[in-house]
From Swiss-Prot:
Taxonomy, superkingdom: Eukaryota
Pfam families associated with the record: Sld7_C, Sld7_N
UniProt keyword Thylakoid present: no
Family of the protein in this entry: Belongs to the SLD7 family.
Organism: Saccharomyces cerevisiae (strain YJM789)
Protein name as it appears in the record: Mitochondrial morphogenesis protein SLD7
Subunit structure, interactors included: Interacts with SLD3.
UniProt subcellular location: Nucleus; Cytoplasm, Cytoskeleton, Spindle pole
Entry keywords, A to Z: Cell cycle, Cytoplasm, Cytoskeleton, DNA replication, Nucleus
Origin organism lineage: Eukaryota, Fungi, Dikarya, Ascomycota, Saccharomycotina
Biological process annotations from GO: DNA replication; regulation of DNA-templated DNA replication initiation
Length: 257
């Protein structure tokens, strides 16, 4: 059952001054502990091409929220700016911060078919990259400080470069594995939602979320061997056709009257 989480107002800045886009209601299909709704304030940052965003900005347990508005100004704005299916609007939240970095949190609003959605940017992987870079700089600084006149500078530089290459290789490998798993989850979710729509099952129907979850879990279990190989870095992506066949089989089983 959908529940209203909060209302978002954000400011546009331009040559003609500031314009506030108001009354953007964020709704979630997932159960939440809090029953109260809040108001978020934000600032428009820029437009982005969703196809060019790295997959890690959307975590595996990320919530996608439905957006609604009764404001004619907001409706006209989104209709004008989100004509391109791959376009997103980046909003910096004024009164919400990322729990890990204590930096501002960001939302990306986008259109999927006729629906307006948004998600919060996941900065976890970015912080890991930043941490690796900081660590490398510290190691290089220590190496330079320990060089003596009698020491071999060539050997020290070579060792430093080898450590950098090894660290970069490990980071790239982890990113590649994470991208494959995120792609699997994203494709699986879209196939399930599409299959439910084709069967005339809307999210207003009782047990909609339960049907979605058991189908998702069952599909993951079906492809557990491939996912295990992916997590070890030795597996290929699960093909779209294979995943589509799995979802169709499961939905036929679970929706059989």
């Amino acid at each position: 059952m959908s529940r209203k989480l909060c209302t978002l107002n954000f400011t546009l800045s331009g040559k003609q001054g500031s314009l506030v886009i108001r009354d953007i209601q964020l709704w979630s299909n997932r159960p939440t502990a809090s029953k109260s709704t809040s108001e978020l304030r934000g600032q428009f940052i820029q437009y982005v091409d969703l196809a060019k965003l790295p997959l890690w900005v959307r975590s595996t347990n990320m919530n996608t929220y439905r957006c609604y508005s009764t404001s004619a100004t907001a409706q006209a704005y989104f209709k004008s700016k989100l004509r391109n299916a791959n376009r997103g609007i980046v909003i910096e939240l004024s009164d919400k911060v990322d729990q890990r970095s204590q930096e501002p949190a960001y939302l990306i609003i986008f259109r999927e078919n006729t629906e307006l959605n948004c998600f919060q940017v996941d900065l976890t992987m970015k912080h890991e990259f930043d941490g690796q870079v900081t660590k490398l700089k510290q190691e290089i600084g220590k190496t330079r400080a320990s060089v003596s006149k009698e020491g071999s500078i060539d050997i020290i530089i070579q060792q430093s470069q080898q450590r950098k290459i090894g660290t970069k290789t490990k980071v790239y490998r982890n990113v590649h594995i994470n991208d494959k798993r995120l792609q699997f989850n994203e494709t699986l979710s879209k196939l399930i939602l599409g299959g439910l729509r084709l069967r005339g099952i809307s999210n207003s129907i009782t047990d909609y979320q339960k049907l979605y979850k058991i189908t998702f879990d069952a599909a993951e279990f079906t492809h557990r061997d491939e996912l295990k190989r992916i997590s070890m870095g030795s597996g290929e992506e699960v093909s779209f056709e294979s995943l589509q066949e799995t979802v169709e089989t499961l939905l036929k089983l679970f929706t059989k009257s």
